């Protein structure tokens, strides 16, 4: 179910979530993706996360190309790409996320729980996503 809200997080920051993988025709493949496609199941998201296929991004052009309003705080041309391999690496600094905040965009109802669990485990502190945002 798509809602048009902003997401407060316990870390007081917001994150844009999408997958930048494409098929042979250049079409996006969805694990988590902002836009008009329907999302996959919770388990598909979980598997994608463990394969490190999900990207956290505040890239302006991605949202523009998806036909969406610019929901991030990033200025035009400002890009922050973070693969999950970066987030789960030992030397990842949570302050990098805080400097590059945007909005969370997910396509699956249960994705919130999956992301909360993963981020909570990674940062060893409770992360709560109150509600999600998808702007078509």
Positions of the model-derived regions?
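Pre-Walker A adenine-sensing motif
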Residues: 1-28, 42
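Hydrophobic, Leu/Ile/Phe/Ala-enriched alpha-helical segments that form helix-helix packing faces
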Residues: 2, 10, 15, 67-72, ...
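Generic recognition of cysteine residues
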Residues: 16-19, 72, 80, 107
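Conserved P-loop
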Residues: 25-94
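Generic hydrophobic/packing signal
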Residues: 37, 45, 53, 110-112, ...
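Broad hydrophobic/π-residue packing in well-ordered secondary structure
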Residues: 66-67, 103, 136
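Conserved RecA-like ASCE ATPase "motif II neighborhood" in helicase/translocase motors
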Residues: 76-128
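A short, conserved beta-to-alpha structural element at the edge of catalytic cores
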Residues: 128-136
């Amino acid at each position: 179910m798509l809602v048009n809200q902003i997401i407060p997080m316990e870390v007081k920051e917001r994150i844009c979530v999408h997958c930048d993988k494409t098929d042979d025709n250049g079409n996006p493949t969805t694990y988590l993706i902002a836009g008009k496609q329907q999302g996959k199941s919770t388990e598909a998201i979980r598997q994608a996360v463990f394969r490190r296929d999900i990207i956290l991004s505040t890239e302006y052009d991605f949202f523009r190309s998806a036909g969406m309003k610019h929901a991030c705080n990033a200025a035009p041309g400002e890009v922050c790409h973070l693969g999950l391999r970066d987030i789960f690496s030992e030397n990842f600094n949570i302050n990098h996320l805080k400097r590059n905040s945007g909005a969370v965009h997910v396509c699956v109802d249960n994705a919130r729980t999956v992301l909360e669990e993963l981020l909570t485990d990674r940062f060893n502190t409770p992360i709560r996503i109150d509600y999600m945002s998808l702007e078509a």
